[in-house]
Design a protein with these regions (language model features):
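Alpha-helical transmembrane segments and their immediate juxtamembrane cytosolic regions
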Residues: 1-374
């Protein structure tokens, strides 16, 4: 399949925003959630699912179900290897530095590992223990493992029932489905990893984004795919919601209702709360409606395109960079000078771009082999 540069560039933009948000600099707060009450994580997961549906759905139609299933499992294994490597990096290099210089940011981030090293290592490799910052790849791996079955059902029987089940799981997650499943696992297996150490993301909420993206991507592989068309009133509503949320976020801050935690939960990121999804759908609608025209008029964004085309190694590298910065400089940017912020940002993106170029160069022989096989 021919790569679509605009999708790579958009994924590259998500990686840039995630890096800026995670790096402990003075830019992280003003540039966090820059488009409203939606973060780069939502866009990255949705776009990754869309690409998976587009690529692997097309593979299933052209080369068969087994080829698609094998490719999904190979991708899941690759992501698992990357997650395992970053996890071991955290448990060795970052732990050693953090303990040696008594860095609170590191000791707080991996407190469970520091008190229970062996159970943390085993449960981390089993995708149960998920330290902060390292909790999105385990969710991604689970989605990849489930996707072959989902795609087969969607291609053979349609997506209505699948999306209905997905919405149902999302709704149950708003009322604590993750905790119910955790409690059941504790009773059945004697699991000792505390609930708060199993990752901030609600898997049962975020699966809805993955399912939505997977369906949208797979639908483009039909011989005569119907374009996504929205009526004028829906576009106007999406524009109004997007503008209101954009102004609201930059006027009030990232907590939409200030200190009112009960109302802030309506925009909760970790459970993909209803108002957050409303904001995300508004931005999606605008991107689908105006994106093609914008892409036709704008120049190619080569740097973002390069980052997005090598999204997995770039994502892992930004984790390594952020962990190193936390270990040596801490989590409070006010404790170091502004010039260090600028130096960290420039050095970080230089490293990410270099990793992306290297990864793409190393992948060329494999890409050529796959293209020849197809």
């Amino acid at each position: 399949m021919t790569r679509r540069w605009e999708l790579d560039a958009l994924r590259g933009l998500m990686l840039v925003l995630m890096t800026v948000t995670h790096l402990p600099t003075r830019l992280s707060s003003p540039l966090g959630q820059p488009f409203g009450f939606v973060s780069a994580a939502e866009g990255f997961v949705l776009l990754s699912a869309y690409m998976a549906g587009l690529v692997y759905g097309g593979m299933a139609r052209k080369r068969g179900i087994e080829a698609m299933r094998t490719a999904f499992w190979r991708r899941a294994l690759k992501v698992y290897a990357c997650h395992g490597a970053t996890l071991l990096f955290l448990f060795t290099v970052i732990a050693a530095v953090g303990v040696r210089i008594d860095q609170p940011a590191v000791k707080d981030l991996m407190s469970y590992y520091l008190t229970h090293p062996l159970p943390a290592l085993v449960s981390g490799l089993l995708l149960v223990y998920k330290p902060a910052l390292l909790d999105i790849l385990p969710m991604y791996i689970l989605f990849l493992l489930a996707s072959p079955w989902v795609l087969v059902q969607g291609l053979r029987r349609g997506w209505t029932a699948l999306m209905g089940m997905s919405v149902g799981l999302w709704m149950l997650a708003q009322f604590g489905l993750d905790m119910w499943v955790y409690d059941a696992a504790v009773r059945l297996t004697g699991l000792r990893v505390p609930f708060q150490e199993t990752g901030a993301f609600s898997t049962f909420s975020w699966q809805f984004l993955w399912m939505l993206g997977l369906w949208m991507g797979a639908s483009r592989t039909r011989p005569d795919p119907r374009p996504f068309i929205f009526p004028g009133w829906a576009v106007a509503l999406a524009l109004a919601v997007a503008v209101v949320c954009f102004v609201w976020r930059h006027w009030i801050g990232q907590a939409p209702f200030g200190a009112n935690e009960s109302l802030n939960l309506l925009f909760d990121k970790w459970r993909l709360a209803p108002l957050r999804l409303f904001n995300l759908f508004a931005l999606m609608g605008l991107a689908i409606r105006f994106g093609p025209g914008l892409v036709a008029r704008m120049p190619r964004l080569r740097a973002l395109e390069t980052l997005g085309a090598a999204s997995l190694p770039v994502f892992c590298m930004q984790l390594v960079i952020v962990l190193l910065v936390l270990a040596f400089f801490g989590a409070n940017p006010e404790l170091h000078p502004v010039w260090l912020d600028m130096l960290l940002v420039i050095a970080s993106f230089s490293a990410l771009y270099a990793v992306a170029r290297l990864a793409l160069r190393l992948d060329r022989p494999a890409d050529a082999k796959r293209a020849k096989a197809s």
